[in-house]
UniProtKB/Swiss-Prot annotation:
GO molecular function: ATP binding; proton-transporting ATP synthase activity, rotational mechanism
Alphabetical list of NCBIfam families matching this protein: ATP_synt_epsi (TIGR01216), PRK00571.1-4 (NF001847)
Family under the similarity heading: Belongs to the ATPase epsilon chain family.
The protein's role, per its UniProt record: Produces ATP from ADP in the presence of a proton gradient across the membrane.
Superkingdom of origin: Bacteria
Compartment list: Cell inner membrane
SUPFAM superfamilies: Epsilon subunit of F1F0-ATP synthase C-terminal domain, Epsilon subunit of F1F0-ATP synthase N-terminal domain
Protein's name in the database: ATP synthase epsilon chain
A GO CC term attached to the entry: plasma membrane
Amino acid sequence: MATIKVDVVSAEEQIFSGEAKFVALPGETGELGILPGHTPLITRIRPGAVRIEVEGGSDEFVFVAGGILEVQPGAVTVLADTAIRGKDLDAAKAEEARKRAEETLQNAKSDLDLAKAQSELATAMAQLEAIQRLAKIRSRH
């Protein structure tokens, strides 16, 4: 089967680089699925899980806290604000971040504080959802 080159990069490091049969991720207007030969595309990414189906049928998961997606016929590049490998996701840390964001939301004194708290809450909730999805997939294997 044909493959496509996939790179997932955050400001801190390269998270994934390799060939894939399929990539699924949360685009700005909904879930995107990308196969080799996809039409060129640039879009924003919402916080959530990137699923990379590699050769052999296994999946790699990366949590992204937003960013930009560039698709070319032979390559997919994810430039993430923050990215965490699926195996490195920590439910306790994500839950703590959710609680902190909710507290900040309650005590926001300005529109800027409110917007920041809303963004942090959305990221924490997306991370918790990604952890749950990954746990379900792992329990099937």
